[in-house]
Design a protein with these regions (language model features):
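Alpha-helix-loop-beta-strand connector modules within alpha/beta enzyme cores
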Residues: 52-93, 180-198
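Acidic (Asp/Glu)-rich catalytic clusters
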Residues: 35-36, 65-66, 86-93, 109-121, ...
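Catalytic beta/alpha-barrel core
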Residues: 43-49, 70-78, 95-105, 126
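Catalytic alpha/beta core domains of metabolic enzymes, predominantly
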Residues: 117-269
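Active-site mouth loops of central-metabolism enzymes
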Residues: 3-29, 53, 99-105, 131-136, ...
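Glycine-rich, proline-tolerant flexible connector loops at the mouths of alpha/beta enzymes
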Residues: 35-73, 166-174, 178
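Extended, intrinsically disordered, low-complexity segments
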Residues: 1-17, 28-29, 240-241, 246-300
């Protein structure tokens, strides 16, 4: 699974201050560190960037590309800022990617022409006019709308990254939303027949938002394995999470097989396996809604 480094984010105090002060050093140091950590893309997250977003994105893109060749995700709702970044982006190892275009007319009409103009990739986000889709079927409907727009604007499948939207396991809707993301991925191969070459991505760490910090890694790792089983090609992640990096590169196959067995409905007694394996069994059951989430799920 490809990794998109999420760390260059305006919400990180040090980075936000550096952006505000136009101080290149912290930004370049972080970009170099992400590249050394082996990420396949670096996400530049400016947030809303309503005031001066165009000038800021142009400066950050130039600043980052002075020191690394890693392709960039341009992450903001400000279309003007995205275009400003694309104007100065230098294609070294791949196209820049617009993160993201929602399945809403105002987003599609504004950003698809920009993507086509600059030969940029797009994250096609399954967020529709009514907000978050309720289930896998609604995700499929929104995906079809976004794919149609890609075809209209000549965006090749290889430049399209479908994001089904990962939601927190701690949310009230988790028993529907967390499994429905998996269900959507089961139909993804059929969608790829409509737009060959299209791949998928997600904000993986969203699944553990709201969980105690020490429990977030196992949620992220387990959900990564579950999504990857059905073709999830990439994820926006912490570039410096070494354990997650191992899972993304296919490490720990014995845990992967165990997770798949639980997904397939096998009842595995946690007492019959090691403590580590039992934790992954329990976590998988929570993520497929066979057990309720609580902060003490590993202790039950």
């Amino acid at each position: 699974m490809l990794r998109v480094g999420e760390n260059l984010n305006v919400m990180v105090k040090k980075i936000g201050t550096a952006m505000k002060d136009r101080d290149p050093k912290p930004i370049q140091e972080l970009a170099i560190a992400e590249a050394k950590a082996g990420v396949d893309f670096i996400d530049i997250n400016l947030g809303p960037a309503r005031k001066g977003g165009g000038e800021l994105m142009e400066w950050v893109v130039k600043t980052v590309q002075e020191v690394v060749d890693t392709p960039l995700y341009l992450d903001t709702i400000n279309a003007e800022a995205i275009e400003a970044g694309l104007k100065v982006y230098k294609k070294k190892k791949g196209n820049a990617v617009i993160n993201s275009i929602m399945a809403r007319p105002e987003s599609m009409d504004l950003k698809f022409p920009i993507a086509a103009k600059y030969n940029a990739g797009v994250v096609a986000l399954l967020w529709g006019p009514s907000g978050l889709p309720r289930d896998a079927d609604e995700r499929g409907v929104l995906a079809a709308e976004l794919m149609q727009k890609c075809l209209e604007f000549g965006i090749p499948g290889e430049d399209v990254w479908m994001d089904p939207i990962v939601t927190p396991v701690t949310s009230p809707q988790s028993q529907v939303q967390v499994p429905s993301c998996i269900e959507f991925m089961k139909m993804f191969k059929d969608l790829q027949e409509i737009l060959p070459g299209m791949r998928s991505t997600c904000g993986l760490s969203n699944v553990s938002n709201g969980a105690p910090e020490h429990l977030r890694p196992i949620l992220n790792q387990t959900y990564m394995m579950m999504l990857e089983r059905f073709g999830m090609a990439s994820a926006i992640v912490d570039a410096f999470d070494e354990d997650l990096k191992k899972f993304a590169s296919g490490g720990r196959p014995e845990l992967r097989k165990l997770v798949y067995r639980v997904m397939d409905g096998e009842e595995i007694d946690p007492k019959s396996v090691s403590k580590e394996e039992a934790d992954y069994v329990k976590t998988t059951r929570v993520l497929i809604a066979k057990a309720l989430y609580s902060d003490s799920w590993l202790e039950l």
